[in-house]
Amino acid sequence: FYSEERVTFLQTQAGKKYVLDSTLEKVEAQVDPEVFFRLNRKYISHVDAIEEVLSYSNSRLKVTLRNCADTDILVSREKVTDLKEWLDR
């Protein structure tokens, strides 16, 4: 799931995109936190969509998602520990 210019989208692993009549906050409350994680203000990712996680400047992480054109998905310092714990499950 991602948000762009106040519009929320669902993107499948096959790359298809669908517009949702919802906010990311509402989506986050509805999805299973065991398999979905709020990466930042713009992205919620399924565990299987995460291709790579790299250390980035200022104690942040850079996440690469499968079938995603945005290559600079940054996770804030505040969420780094939560993301690492979530991935280690």
Regions found by a protein language model. Give the residues of each.
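C-terminal output/interaction extensions
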Residues: 77, 81-89
